[in-house]
């Protein structure tokens, strides 16, 4: 085995291509793998991948710990390396996986703070009078993030045919390319309809099917949404650190507090917990829609309300 042949940037690039094309991971996730591998390579030095040992992996984890990295960050790095070494073994470029049994120090689980219902209402209701195209787009984005508990990557991957305005439903592609069907409340539907009326003003290419586009007619980037959300939060006197995942967490918190139905909430969130996924698959859409209608502060998705 030629150690140098896979100890190059090309090997890492090939692995990243594999993640994007074969495993169909989002660009954001692939970039995370890339950052982890670059940092690991820096800390491990020039030693070929196939000569690294369990001791090297423990030393890497210890080095990250000394740098003050959290247990979660170290575990993510080790997870990246385990995945990378599995790929190398599959390609015949490594004999074993030295990261397989290495565990990072446990860190306490800290959930992001949720906005309360009044704060969410202030955030969303304050922008309903602005008819500028970008403002209408941002309003639809914020409404959907909270109405459906979307991950940022899920929001950005939405296409025009992802939402059924008549049936008040959204088809979302989540982690692992898994799809789920979500009910959508009246305020979010109204916001999306208003956005779709002005969306043609920003279109530069007739084949652009992204639901949310930039002022240049391209599919929105994660940083654009994050920056716009922070801007709207500041304008409305809310936490400057407001980010898309905080709206997702607020969605989950408010539904769980109102319904107490943990299984339905986790199904709506698209969580893929190996220990509990089988339970969630038995919940049908009608049950999820009923939980949503009865518990979500901005639901009201009955057909007669939509007229």
From Swiss-Prot:
Upper taxonomic lineage: Bacteria, Pseudomonadati, Pseudomonadota, Gammaproteobacteria, Oceanospirillales
InterPro entries assigned to the protein according to its UniProt record, in alphabetical order: CB (IPR044068), DNA_brk_join_enz (IPR011010), Integrase-like_cat_sf (IPR013762), Integrase_catalytic (IPR002104), Integrase_recombinase_N (IPR010998), Integrase_SAM-like_N (IPR004107), Recomb_XerC (IPR011931), Tyrosine_recombinase_XerC/XerD (IPR023009)
Active site: 151, 175, 245, 248, 271, 280
GO biological process, one term: chromosome segregation
Record's protein name: Tyrosine recombinase XerC
Tyr recombinase domain location: 110-293
Subunit structure of this chain's protein: Forms a cyclic heterotetrameric complex composed of two molecules of XerC and two molecules of XerD.
Record-linked PANTHER family: PHAGE INTEGRASE-RELATED, TYROSINE RECOMBINASE XERC
GO molecular function: DNA binding; tyrosine-based site-specific recombinase activity
Ranges for domain Core-binding (CB): 6-89
Source organism (scientific name): Alcanivorax borkumensis (strain ATCC 700651 / DSM 11573 / NCIMB 13689 / SK2)
Predominant cellular place of this UniProt entry's protein: cytoplasm
Family statement drawn from the similarity comment of this UniProt entry: Belongs to the 'phage' integrase family. XerC subfamily.
UniProt KW Disulfide bond keyword: no
Compartments, as annotated in UniProt: Cytoplasm
SUPFAM superfamilies: DNA breaking-rejoining enzymes
A Pfam family it matches: Phage_int_SAM_1
Entry GO terms, CC: cytoplasm
Function: Site-specific tyrosine recombinase, which acts by catalyzing the cutting and rejoining of the recombining DNA molecules. The XerC-XerD complex is essential to convert dimers of the bacterial chromosome into monomers to permit their segregation at cell division. It also contributes to the segregational stability of plasmids.
Alphabetically ordered keywords of this record: Cell cycle, Cell division, Chromosome partition, Cytoplasm, DNA integration, DNA recombination, DNA-binding
Keyword DNA-binding: yes
